[in-house]
């Protein structure tokens, strides 16, 4: 009986000494999720306004002239696959012409509209294509510091995958904000936000 009484007193004493203070910060709870930049903007307009001017704030945008740092003054030639690439603006649309020439004649031609620009332009602008929500990297990048139009990193030396480099969730969340990703897919998105 004394053991039970002692055990009961121990439990009561121990529970009374616990620190049950609640935190003033709501974001430490496990059910709190990412709310996005526009939610923050409602209370922190000054921080939002300065952030969107940083490299991270300009990290991912739709492919429009005003978001591009690229100069498309020459074409790219892949000497291994024998493809020529010429990006250019058609009005506000960024398109990539991919073609092959044999005996001074065009034997293959594909025109693809570019949907997104990834990279702030501080170092590079790379380019993303959306095919019904499936995102892939286009085979050209503009290196702004050297003003060079060339293949993206990893596409050189015979590794040009053309339009087959999938933009997976890991790539997207590092270079952009949290997207609405289709679970079970490798590169399908329901919605892609614009910048971190």
Locations of the language-model features?
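Bacterial Sec-dependent N-terminal signal peptides
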Residues: 1-26
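Sequence context of c-type cytochrome heme-c attachment sites
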Residues: 19-38, 42-196
């Amino acid at each position: 009986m004394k053991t039970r009484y002692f055990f009961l007193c121990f439990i009561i004493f121990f529970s009374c000494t616990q620190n049950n203070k609640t935190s003033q910060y709501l974001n430490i709870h496990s059910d709190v999720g990412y709310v996005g930049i526009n939610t923050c903007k409602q209370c922190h307009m000054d921080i939002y306004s300065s952030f969107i001017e940083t490299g991270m704030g300009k990290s991912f945008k739709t492919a429009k002239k005003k978001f591009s740092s690229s100069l498309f003054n020459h074409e790219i030639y892949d000497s291994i696959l024998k493809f020529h690439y010429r990006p250019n603006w058609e009005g506000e649309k960024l398109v990539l012409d991919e073609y092959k020439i044999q005996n001074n004649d065009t034997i293959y031609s594909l025109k693809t509209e570019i949907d997104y620009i990834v990279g702030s332009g501080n170092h590079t602008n790379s380019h993303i294509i959306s095919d019904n929500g499936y995102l892939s990297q286009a085979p050209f990048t503009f290196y702004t510091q050297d003003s060079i139009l060339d293949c993206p990193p990893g596409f050189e030396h015979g590794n040009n995958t053309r339009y087959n480099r999938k933009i997976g969730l890991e790539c997207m969340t590092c270079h952009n904000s949290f997207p609405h990703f289709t679970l079970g897919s490798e590169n399908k998105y329901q919605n892609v936000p614009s910048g971190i």
